Curated annotation (Swiss-Prot):
Signal peptide boundaries: none
Top-rank taxon, per record: Eukaryota
Region Disordered: start-end pairs: 1-53, 87-116, 287-322
Any one Pfam family match given in the protein's UniProt record, by short name: Homeodomain
Protein name in UniProt: POU domain, class 5, transcription factor 1B
Location of the DNA-binding region in this protein: 229-288
InterPro entries, per the entry: HD, Homeobox_CS, Homeodomain-like_sf, Lambda_DNA-bd_dom_sf, POU, POU_dom, POU_domain_TF
Gene3D superfamilies per the UniProt record, alphabetical: Homeodomain-like, lambda repressor-like DNA-binding domains
Domain POU-specific positions: 138-212
GN (gene name): POU5F1B
One annotated GO molecular function: DNA-binding transcription factor activity, RNA polymerase II-specific
Tissues with expression: Detected in epithelial cells of the prostate (at protein level). Detected at the mRNA level in several cancer tissues (breast, uterine cervix, lung, thyroid gland, esophagus, colon, urinary bladder, and glioma).
């Protein structure tokens, strides 16, 4: 059936096309939908464009038109305005409301064109704002207020001689949370999200009020800067003291009651000694785990004995096979060294003639 359908499909012209018409002048490819609307069943008469047979002519219940795909038969869904029409009726124009989804009707009689989909999806927040025009107006007004406040904050900070880092430190003094210089910079540049801008504005508003009323704010800022610098100070231990700590660590890796005595003996703070021993234990754990893994790998060695081991290739085409049709193998050599006195086995080399000149 597939072969018969393909032959009829390729060469059967529609009815009414003689040798003189445009359809009969020369053979050509016929559009599948046009062919299905004109062509009758195999061995039956052709069907005109306005009249279609009923189920009694076909002998089977009506079904979607078949299409031949890759040697098999596949059924396609019904097309809008294309195919067989009811028996005894002429072709009628389909109203626009009954047209299929995604198809636009054309008054000129041309083929229907799919509707264009708008590029991209609109953000959820924007959709919510469009649904609530009153809320959208309130948010726009609040955004303008934030822009004006950001300009005021920058002017006030530069006029009083504060840096963005100073503002973050003073906020830490006032509210117990230090903000970074990057956060203040992004607020002034309106680069934070709308939600974060609204959260940070009351805190910065408090800073503006304190900067106008409190003259000692600059001194507080300097004191806080010194405290932050002291917190960030990196502890450095001399080589001699570090050597003594290493010796003590070998004797007792985890001292508890001896930390105070060790700190007093070496002239260090108790917290410094405690942190050093904690870091040293972590370093020892990492080193021991790496060493154990390396020992296990070396003890296991290679799963193959000495000498080449052949494996079949992976599935797929292989080019440049030296045997010209013989199975291709990849030689893997073991990393286990040969014992002393043992030499490599001789490798036999077979000279292959070129297949182009072979008789």
């Amino acid at each position: 059936m597939a072969g018969h359908l393909a032959s009829d499909f390729a060469f059967s012209p529609p009815p009414g096309g003689g040798g003189d018409g445009p359809w009969g002048a020369e053979p050509g490819w016929v559009d599948p939908l046009t062919w299905l609307s004109f062509q009758g069943p195999p061995g039956g008469p052709g069907i005109g464009p306005g009249v279609g047979p009923g189920s009694e002519v076909w002998g089977i219940p009506p079904c979607p038109p078949p299409y031949e795909l890759c040697g098999g038969m596949a059924y396609c869904g019904p097309q809008v305005g294309v195919g067989l029409v009811p028996q005894g009726g002429l072709e009628t124009s389909q109203p626009e409301s009954e047209a299929g989804v995604g198809v636009e009707s054309n008054s000129n009689g041309a083929s229907p064109e799919p509707c264009t989909v708008p590029p991209g999806a609109v953000k959820l927040e924007k959709e919510k704002l469009e649904q609530n025009p009153e809320k959208s107006q309130d948010i726009k007004a609040l955004q303008k207020e934030l822009e004006q406040f950001a300009k005021l904050l920058k002017q006030k900070r530069i006029t009083l001689g504060y840096t963005q880092a100073d503002v973050g430190l003073i906020l830490g003094v006032l509210f117990g949370k230090v903000f970074s210089q990057k956060t203040i910079c992004r607020f002034e540049a309106l680069q934070l999200s709308f939600k974060n801008m609204c959260k940070l504005r009351p805190l910065l508003q408090k800073w503006v009020e304190e900067a106008d009323n409190n003259e000692n704010l600059q001194e507080i800022c300097k004191a806080e800067t010194l405290m932050q610098a002291r917190k960030r100070k990196r502890t450095s231990i001399e080589n001699r003291v570090r050597g003594n700590l290493e010796n003590l660590f070998l004797q007792c890796p985890k001292p508890t009651l001896q930390i105070s005595h060790i700190a007093q003996q070496l002239g260090l703070e108790k917290d410094v000694v405690r942190v050093w021993f904690c870091n040293r234990r972590q370093k020892g754990k990492r080193s021991s785990s790496d060493y154990a893994q390396r020992e296990d790998f070396e003890a296991a060695g290679s799963p193959f004995s000495g000498g080449p081991v052949s494996f079949p290739p992976a599935p797929g085409p292989h080019f440049g096979t030296p045997g010209y049709g013989s199975p291709h193998f990849t030689a893997l050599y073991s990393s286990v060294p040969f014992p002393e006195g043992e030499v490599f086995p001789p490798v036999s080399v077979i000279t292959l003639g070129s297949p182009m000149h072979s008789n």
